[in-house]
Amino acid sequence: MLFSSVFFLFAFLPIVLFFYFIVCKRSMLAKNILLLFASLFFYAWGEPKFVLVMIVSIVANYIFGIAINKQLTAYENKGRLAKIILVLSVIFNLSILFIFKYLNFTLFNLNLIFKNIFPQTEILLPIGISFFTFQAMSYVIDVYRKTVDVQKNPLYLALYISFFPQLIAGPIVRYSTIEEQISSRTVTGADFSEGIRRFLIGLSKKVILANNFALVADQAFNIVGNNNISIAFAWLGSIAYTMQIFFDFSAYSDMAIGLGRMFGFKFLENFNYPYVSSSVSEFWRRWHISLGQWFRDYVYIPLGGSRVPNKVLVIRNLLIVWLLTGIWHGANWTFILWGLLYFALLAFEKIMGIPNKFESKQSKVLYAIFTFLMVNFGWVLFRSNNLLQAGIYLKAMFGLGDVIGIDNMFYQYFGEYWMFFFVGAVYSTGIFSYLRKRLSKIDILDRIIEFLGIAVYTVLFLISVSYLVMGAYNPFIYFNF
């Protein structure tokens, strides 16, 4: 089920809110059970058979958590068995991911090498499996580390793993973030209104901006294989996808955070205007923050992080993290190469001491431009169906081969969508958020902004709904991961 669908907006969400605040208002247990069943229904709406995969994951990780906690508390000085259980839990979770996400890819490539000696499988990918599996893994690991208390109520743990706002495409919520909120939370009028505001921002970003950028990007990537793309349209298409993936993914996070707020949950931010970054390392502190923190805390730091005896080990740790990051995003060589690209860029920055090495404003600005270009090239890899398409597209961007500089398709699409590019570029700088915070410090302006905000969000909602009713392009990119 999509957040940006008529059924979700006008049926599912209103019904869940009604039962949550009216029927179940006196019991936290009843509220949590309602949200759990709503979440299972939400997931089963599009993939009824795969809800069993998630239930198996929930049950298994509940048992792993209980077993580890029992060993740690009953045998304080004998945590060896607890460690074995932890390893088994990691193997179990990674096995689920491998079977559903990587087995097809692995067998296909092995058959290329060994002349089709393995049967080819066509296992379908459960939506959001990477997200709820990483949440489940982090919970069990944190129980072992004693950074969270074990959740003894299986329904509450099930709610944590399956909660519908962040189930499909994040953010990856740590159990420590909502540990207390699961059993005790309140929703004030300010919380609910802020949740609505944040949800409407996300809905507008998705339907009005991301979906329109997608029309440009899809056209560019669809025609590139026929060598019919000009240099100008190749660049326009790549920038369109750069904008699309930001507004698409951050929109989902906005809606997830807003929905969570409506029900009393406060999730951490997942994006912080990444395209204004002055370096690649800063970009990854601003982009998909929850994933970066997950790999930092559960892979990079356990390997030794940057506190290892020499830079060779630092580079090794970066290589492992970014290879895994690429693989996490999908079973395709394009994602693996995308991860390795960021490994190379981050290793370069680590070795050279960038951006701290720059002293002049000009050098910092130039490196910020370089960073954006590298991110843009990375998204070409990310969007391409295979390495061949990525190579052809990048060649077209640099005018290599039989391509022309500019064509009618560029004029057509730029003429039709230039306003979306302008609004997207301005919004991605964070200037709107900055001005809102500064002006809100003045009482009279704060009241004016609040009044105008209601009108603006109402208009944006109506425009978004009109797009949805017309059946506009709508799926979220990160549903595939």
Q: What residue ranges belong to the model's regions?
A:
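Membrane-embedded transmembrane alpha-helical bundles that form the catalytic cores
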Residues: 1-480
